[in-house]
């Protein structure tokens, strides 16, 4: 057990180790999402959606591309939702030619980027202190039940649209599967659902995350507290110091890829500081324990409160209810990778037959988990998405 604790602790605090070295960084590593958008010459807007349980979620918007600034025609709306540990910044972490949000904006779409509770920019609440245990008492259940509905409904109200397109990566795919299968009114507001590196069941997960089942929840809470895990405060020090020095940079890359799938040739090492800033942004310990549960049990279900009596209190049954993915009827397109250690090919194969209205599924043999968002070849996926969006409008796929 000691070596497992050591490994997880290394990931948790290594940002403090790298702060001993100095180097230059990419300017975007210091920027909020809106500033990155402006940095590349695009118009940026910021909003806040308030969830039913009081969390304040930032929304970043690119209302138009560089070449359609003066267009008055109503634009189709796309919501991009980030994955585990990430922020909305993951969609703009590369230059415009290889960042999905910029590509969509230049193609004429009104692009919105959501931020899940507990990530770097989403640590505000109407009345809870972000330093309190109460603020961090959430898992992906609350993202499914509260975050996604609040985000989508805000966008619809602001744009006047009745439906939007949804793109979710990793956890962004998971909360879509959960929300759109349990909330049919919300599902009706989605034209087409795009899932990148989708996770639901995690039985075959590999890498550092696969160690989670070896931790008892009580011990995990003692070691990492009951608040935030993988704080961006620690990891963001990487973007201000040593991740461009060759030896240390290689260490950064190794840690970065150890959680997602090791295909280093797909990663632009000169931008690792930006990726770490926006792709290692923290979450709650309870969320991580929920993933531990999913890995250990191999099912997509609500959070297990640890006893039959507590489950009965929360769910009116002694065991956590399952998320029945089959109940999601939205036309869905999926992309998965053969080198993905989180969305393993065996888990994806288990998920595929449960997608009731799967219109497209592409497996890229050499893609890892993050290749779909920040990889050098991410534009291949962007091109596929644009083709399906065009087909959706012309052939009425939804």
UniProtKB/Swiss-Prot annotation:
User: GO biological process annotations for this chain's record?
Assistant: lipid metabolic process
GO cellular component terms, A-Z = extracellular space
* Function according to Swiss-Prot or TrEMBL: Female-specific protein which lacks detectable lipase activity against a range of substrates. Binds the hydrophobic lipid 1-aminoanthracene with high affinity.
Q: Which cysteines are joined by disulfide bonds?
A: 243-252
Induction, per UniProt:
Repressed by the androgen dihydrotesterone (DHT), the estrogen estradiol (E2) and the thyroid hormone triiodothyronine (T3) (at protein level).
The PTM entry states: N-glycosylated.
What is the protein name given in its UniProt record?
Tear acid lipase-like protein
| Residues that carry a glycan | 268
* Family per record: Belongs to the AB hydrolase superfamily. Lipase family.
Q: In which tissues is it expressed?
A: Expressed in female lacrimal gland acinar cells from where it is secreted into tears (at protein level).
Catalytic site residues? 170 (nucleophile), 340 (charge relay system), 369 (charge relay system)
Supply the source organism for this entry.
Mesocricetus auratus
Does the entry feature the keyword Translocase, yes or no? no
PANTHER family recorded: LYSOSOMAL ACID LIPASE-RELATED
Compartments where found:
Secreted
């Amino acid at each position: 057990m000691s070596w497992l604790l050591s490994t997880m602790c290394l990931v948790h605090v290594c940002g403090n180790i790298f702060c001993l070295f100095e180097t230059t960084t990419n300017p975007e590593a210091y920027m909020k999402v809106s500033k990155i958008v402006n940095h590349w010459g695009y118009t940026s807007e910021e909003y806040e959606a308030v969830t039913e349980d009081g969390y304040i979620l930032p929304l970043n918007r690119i209302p138009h591309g560089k070449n359609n600034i003066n267009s008055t025609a109503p634009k189709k709306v796309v919501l991009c939702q980030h994955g585990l540990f990430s922020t909305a910044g993951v969609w703009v972490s590369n230059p415009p030619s290889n960042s999905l949000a910029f590509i969509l904006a230049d193609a004429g779409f009104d692009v919105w980027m959501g931020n899940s509770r507990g990530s770097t920019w989403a640590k505000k609440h109407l009345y809870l202190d972000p330093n309190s245990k109460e603020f961090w008492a959430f898992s992906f259940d609350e993202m499914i039940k509260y975050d996604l509905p609040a985000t989508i409904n805000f966008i619809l109200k602001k744009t006047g649209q009745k439906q939007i397109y949804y793109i979710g990566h990793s956890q962004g795919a998971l909360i879509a599967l959960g929300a759109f299968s349990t909330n049919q009114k919300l599902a009706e507001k989605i034209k087409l659902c795009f899932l990148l590196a989708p996770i639901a069941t995690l039985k075959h997960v590999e890498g550092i995350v696969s160690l989670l089942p070896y931790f008892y929840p009580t011990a995990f809470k003692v070691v990492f507290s009951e608040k935030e895990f993988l704080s961006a405060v620690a990891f963001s020090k990487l973007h201000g110091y040593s991740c461009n020095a060759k030896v240390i940079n290689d260490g950064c890359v190794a840690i970065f890829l150890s959680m997602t799938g090791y295909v280093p040739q797909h990663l632009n090492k000169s931008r690792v500081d930006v990726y770490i800033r926006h792709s290692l942004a923290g979450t709650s310990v309870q969320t991580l324990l929920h993933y531990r549960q999913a890995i250990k049990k191999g099912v997509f279900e609500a959070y297990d409160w640890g006893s039959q009596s507590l489950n009965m209190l929360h769910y009116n049954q002694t065991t956590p209810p399952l998320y029945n993915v089959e109940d999601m009827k939205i036309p869905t397109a999926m992309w998965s990778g053969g080198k993905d250690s989180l969305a393993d090919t065996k888990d994806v194969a288990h998920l595929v037959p449960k997608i009731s209205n799967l219109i497209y599924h592409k497996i890229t043999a050499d893609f890892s988990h993050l290749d779909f968002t920040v990889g050098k070849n991410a534009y291949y996926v962007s091109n596929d998405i644009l083709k399906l969006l065009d087909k959706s409008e012309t052939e009425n796929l939804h």
